[in-house]
Each structure stands twice: as C-alpha cells, then as structure tokens.
Regions:
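Nucleic-acid-binding small beta-barrel platforms of the OB/S1 family
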Residues: 31-33
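Structured C-terminal cores of nucleic-acid metabolism proteins
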Residues: 6, 24, 29, 39-229
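Glycine-rich phosphate/pyrophosphate-binding loops
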Residues: 7-21
C-alpha cells in the first residue's frame, strides 16, 4: 500500500498525467437502502460526513461478523460501494482513505502497473507530461478488462459448483439461510459454499409470508419462523 501510495503522490504533486487507482464515495441512494435494511437488525450508519460514513461501514462489518445476518449485510454493504477503477483523473481512493493511490507493485500480472512503472521512469528521466486522453483510454480499457476477468472468475466458480452438485443430487448437506425474500429463501451449503434458492411454494409444512420487520418467513398456522442463520 505504501509503495502504491507514494508513487502516485510523487507524480500527482507534479501535476503530470499518471495512472491512478481511484475509488469514489458510496452511492447515497444505496446507502439509504442499506440503512433501511440494517436498522431491522439494530445497526445504523452515520452519514454526516465522508469520514463518518467510512467509520460506520467499517464498524458495521466488524459488528456483523459471525452473526446470522452477516451474509446479507456484507452483500448489501459491498453493493452500496462504488467500484474502484483506473483513471488519469485523480479523485483519491475512498475505501483506503488515500488522496493518492495507484497500482504499482504487481507489473507481472497487471498492465496498469506496467504503465505506472514506465511513466515513473519516464518522469524521473525528465520527460514532460504525456497525453492524458491517450492514457485515459488505456485506463478505461484496463477497467473493462478487470470487470470481465472478475465476471469470468465468478462464472467459473458457479459452473464448477453446479457441476459438483449434479453429481450429488441425492446427498443431504448442512446449510445456513443466507437470504430471505418475499418469494423464498437462499441457502448456502456450509461445506462447499454452494448457494441455491428454495421458493416459498416448495416449503410444504405451512403457508409462509414474508415479514419485513423480522426479515423472515412466518408460517400463518404454526407461526414457525424461518430467518437468517
């Protein structure tokens, strides 16, 4: 982190074109939606300032660790955050609370790091600021490719999970309820992290309705409660 920070700061203060790793503030509407959900579990977000939001989110993730609602809160918190990307326009890195940040330390596996190395050497040798538009195009392409790589990774994991479960159709697994909605529940198998949905109509022992205050399904006759965890 220190190397990434200092290289970006060294060039940034010279006002020369550089490849930054930037991270914008969380989306306000998504934060409000997150606040609505977590309030049902007794949590809150202080949205008075950027610093307060950052501290609140970190505290929230620490507080839910190991709790039955952790999976839901973790997912919603991540979704409320902006995605980090590459750009020549430095706005800082919100998640790390850095005014200057770059990806510099892994040129063996990331092209933006290669660009950062080349620009650093070029400027140390006395070079003038390079064309910002040219490098902004490279940054946009790098961000797009990063997104595709992340999606490919998620898809490959899902594919292998489906392939595994096809060979274990009649086997019983221990799972936890990772999500509750008005149309059903999500169950994650503890052993292998595979997740699937059980629709309300497939739960035959009662007629269940969604209780948004408890974030649970409640049986109309038995009053049985199906909730996170």
């Amino acid at each position: 982190l220190l190397a990434n920070k200092k290289v970006a700061e060294f060039i940034g203060k010279q006002k020369k074109t550089f490849v930054y790793r930037i991270h914008d503030e969380p989306n306000e509407d998504k934060l409000i939606n997150l606040q609505t959900v977590i309030s049902k579990f007794g949590y809150a977000i202080n949205m008075k300032s950027k610093q307060d939001i950052s501290k609140s989110l970190n505290k929230l993730l620490n507080d839910v660790n190991g709790k039955k609602e952790q999976n839901l809160v973790d997912t919603l918190t991540i979704r409320s955050m902006s995605k980090a990307k590459y750009s020549t326009e430095n706005i800082g890195h919100y998640g790390l609370a850095f005014d200057y940040y770059s990806h510099f330390t892994s040129p063996i596996r990331r092209y933006p790091d290669v660009m950062a190395h080349r620009l650093l050497q070029y400027y140390i040798d006395g070079g003038k600021s390079v064309d910002a538009d040219t490098y902004e195009e490279k940054c946009a392409h790098s961000s797009d490719m990063e997104g595709l790589a992340a999606q490919a990774e998620r898809d490959s994991v899902k594919y292998m999970q489906v392939k595994y479960m096809q060979d274990h159709k009649d086997q019983e697994f221990l799972g936890v309820i990772s999500g509750v909605t008005e149309w059903g529940i999500y169950v994650e198998i503890i052993e292998n992290k595979c997740e699937g949905m059980v629709r309300i109509r497939e739960i035959k022992d009662d007629y269940y309705t969604f209780d948004d205050k408890q974030y649970a399904l409640v049986g109309q006759v038995s009053k049985n409660i199906i909730q996170l965890g």
